[in-house]
A protein has these predicted regions:
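Alpha-helical interface subdomain recognition
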Residues: 1-90, 107-112, 119-123, 139, ...
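A short, Trp-centered hydrophobic/proline-enriched beta-strand micro-motif
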Residues: 123-131
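Short Gly/Pro-enriched turn/cap motifs at secondary-structure boundaries
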Residues: 93-95, 120, 135-138, 162-165, ...
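Short glycine/proline-enriched turns and hinge-like loops at secondary-structure junctions
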Residues: 71-72, 139-141, 165-170, 183-186, ...
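Helix-loop "lid/cap" segments that line or gate small-molecule binding pockets
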Residues: 98-107
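Flexible, small-/acidic-enriched active-site or ligand-binding loops
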Residues: 142, 195-226
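A short core secondary-structure module
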Residues: 157-201
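Conserved hydrophobic/aromatic beta-strand scaffold that supports enzyme active sites
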Residues: 128, 142-146, 153, 171-175, ...
Length: 387
């Protein structure tokens, strides 16, 4: 029984492990060296983007028929995890490309898919997601951005807030009210291009973490777009937005895993080298207990995240629950693990000369975006009570 090597349950296929190794190699050489600089300057890590693009890791989820690598949901999560291990800001390149394009994959016309997905797959463009507004965060259905039909066009007016990679991305999935009397059933989704007249951007937000990924407001001032840029049928936008988040919360869980893994790896190396009272800090039982808890939480989060990724790929009925659970658990674990990593480094961990304080700051956002963890618990409870 112990010698049975073909038992593959709870073991990643070789091709997924190969993807991990390939991403890790690229990130070690061409992404990690830019992580501190991206954090210090707050500038988009173009060198990291170029490296990921060259290796086809910038938008791995896009199907082969649209020019993409055709990675499944688990492989995509592994890519994001490994990039986040090196640089959280850079991990938002593949993560947000998936977030922005998922509405097209779920509900877009074949023409829209061929027109836009191929540009993202080639690396010529990035795609962002515009759901939140200044007064519509967790309550996204209360948005006020309007889209009014005018012949063969729609005219959009409004403000979107907290838009990741805004100004860098060429394309945007924008959710807007087309029927003010229908609340969530009166919201529709559109593709807006950066070059459309009337599109502009606010100043970059001054953030705690993920500083290399710009976060800006997107202003829509009489933006006139062709009617064929609606994603799905009129009034189905909010449902598409929620279905999208079911899938992409898994990618935020993967991002949290990567940040936490990077912090644990660095802390392990540090405590083995650092000596106090005549021996390595790692030899103290109290430190070993901390490391054990960090590793345990991380592996539990990884198993849940990979299970959720499998459900995303299959389109399982319980994806809503598992996507929320993975995002919530992994991000809470990442915040705890990165905080403990800072503690293990002591005063050094509190300085910018060491990466763990950056990782702690980067981890915080994973508890907030794509639905706060309080909202995730509401989502999970509702799913449990439906059964």
């Amino acid at each position: 029984m112990a010698a049975e090597q073909s038992f593959d349950v709870y073991r990643l296929p070789e091709e997924h492990e190969a993807i991990r190794e390939a991403v890790r190699e690229v990130c070690a050489a061409k992404v990690a060296p830019h992580a501190a600089e991206a954090d210090e300057t707050g500038e988009f890590p173009k060198a990291s983007y170029d490296a990921l693009r060259a290796a086809d890791f910038h938008a791995p989820h896009i199907p082969v028929e649209y020019g993409g690598a055709g990675a499944d949901a688990l492989a995509t999560a592994i890519v994001i995890e490994e990039v986040a291990r090196a640089c959280a800001s850079s991990s938002l390149i593949p993560a947000v490309n998936k977030l922005g394009t998922m509405p097209l994959l779920l509900a877009g016309s074949e023409d829209l898919k061929r027109r836009y997905l191929s540009r993202v797959a080639s690396g010529d463009a990035m795609f962002s997601y515009c759901l939140s507004e200044p007064e519509a965060g967790s309550d996204a259905a209360s948005m006020t951005t309007r889209a009014v039909r005018d012949g063969d066009h729609w005219v959009l007016n409004g403000v979107k807030r907290w838009i990741t990679n805004a100004g860098v991305s060429e394309f945007y999935t924008v959710f807007a009210v087309t029927d003010p009397t229908a609340r969530s059933r009166g919201i529709s989704a559109f593709v807006v291009e950066k070059s459309d007249a009337g599109v502009s951007f606010g100043a970059p937000e001054k953030k705690l973490g993920i500083k290399g990924s710009p976060t800006r407001e997107v202003y829509l001032d009489n933006v006139r777009i062709p009617a064929d840029r609606m994603i799905g049928a009129e009034g189905t936008g909010f449902a598409t937005a929620m279905r999208t988040l079911d899938h992409t919360r898994v990618t935020i869980a993967a991002q949290a895993l990567g940040i936490a893994q990077g912090a644990l790896d660095y802390a392990k190396g540090y405590v083995q080298e650092r000596k106090q009272f005549g021996k390595a800090v790692a030899e103290f039982q109290g430190v070993q207990f901390m490391l054990a808890d960090m590793g345990m939480k991380l592996e539990a989060a990884r198993q849940l995240t990979y299970a959720a990724a499998g459900k995303s790929e299959r389109g399982d009925a319980d994806l809503t629950y598992f996507g929320a659970a993975a995002k919530c658990f992994a991000s809470d674990a990442a915040m705890e693990i990165t905080t403990d990593a800072v503690q293990l480094l002591g005063g050094y961990g509190y300085t910018r000369d060491y990466p763990v304080e950056r990782m702690m700051r980067d981890a915080k956002i994973t508890q907030i975006y794509e639905g706060t963890n309080q909202v995730q618990r509401i989502v999970m409870a509702r799913q449990l009570l439906k059964d």
